[in-house]
Amino acid sequence: MVADDLTGAADTALAFWEHGLDAAILLGPLAPRPAALQTVSDARVVAVDTATRRRPPAAAGRAVAATVNALRRGGVTRFYKKIDSTLRGNCGAEIEAMLAACGASVAVVCPAFPAQGRTVVDGRVRVHGQDLMAAPIAVDPGGGAASSRVAEALGRQTRLPIAEARRPDELGQSMRRGIVVVDAATDADLARWVDRVGLDSDVLWAGSAGLAGALARATARRTAPARRVAAAEAASSVWRPVVVVVGSLHAVSRGQMAALLTLPGATLVSCHPAGIVRGQVSIDEVVERCVGIVREGGHCVLSTSASEETRRELAELGREAGHGPGWAGERIAAWLGAVTAAVIQAEMGLERVICTGGDTARAALLRLGAPGLTVVGAVSPGVPIGRTIDSRLYVVTKAGGFGGQDTLARAVTLLQGDMEEWADGRG
């Protein structure tokens, strides 16, 4: 699987892990002959984060093609293109590049993720029943979707023919070449498309973790039993500190953080985002505060303010610097990742981290020299627990808009306990 950010790679890998298929996530784009593939040779499913969501379309396409070519040289024969469920990023350019690189003639595309309230009805993305362009999630500081109509959004970045199908019996001639956008409002709808097209057909599937789950279920019927998703209420007498980094500005993540801060031992370390961008916030002082909380056995919650005034200020900083809307966010994510890595390195007993926002998690893992994660459990659908490939650091990654009000609190409750049951495959 090839994804344009880390949380997307992780939640899609989780969809396969939940159905009994060992899964790993690698930080890409991959080199022509990636040694990293050898570190995950036991995995049945490998998801690669190309970190291309905010790159120019042509550059994103080249990175995806290079990654697919590297995977093919490593022996991979089946591919899935992960795209954002709300059409952010370079969906059209990356699907076109991946079609060419993997040698398929047609892509079946459906970004629906019903478990997270994302559906495709009449060719348009809806979020909890609301048209994407009217939903709060459409306001993304890094650049949101250009249209709720999937075909229109893709067509802005590709010249391939794009057809639409509402029902499986409408596929017909459209399956010869190009892109076919299909509707799905439920997991059962997604399963019907998989049953209609089949696992052995020469198509490129492209979608979110929702479609990946349908493919995983069909694959598992042939090969493996499903796993149980973790219940965060699992009792444990063990208490270990957890660092939670809320890098996403999404209102859902902010509500989850507020609920998390009601837990015993949870302490907030808040930094002004504009100050971070301007270099006015001391990274050493913030690291010292975080380490102090962890050494006292508490849960450190590191975040930035997310008011409308803050958003406007960050946008203005980007314009002043001559950059696009996502520039300030990228700098903040890199800074939060650097703080997270420094806290882990300073407090060697720390083994549990939660990150909302893929850029933050990726920055921290790169600082730590970790090539990627293996999936070892789940907090809830779309919210995986990973363990770094080369150490015993447990990492929960979560897309900003995913989960319910208690998701971060549940994640901390689970991670503060004994994680060995997940690591040895009994999750």
Region spans (language model):
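Conserved, well-structured core segments that form the ligand-binding/active-site neighborhood
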Residues: R126-R289
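A structural-propensity feature for long, helix-poor, extended segments
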Residues: S41-A51, R295-G298, R387-W422
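Conserved, well-ordered active-site substructure
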Residues: G349-R352, T356-R410
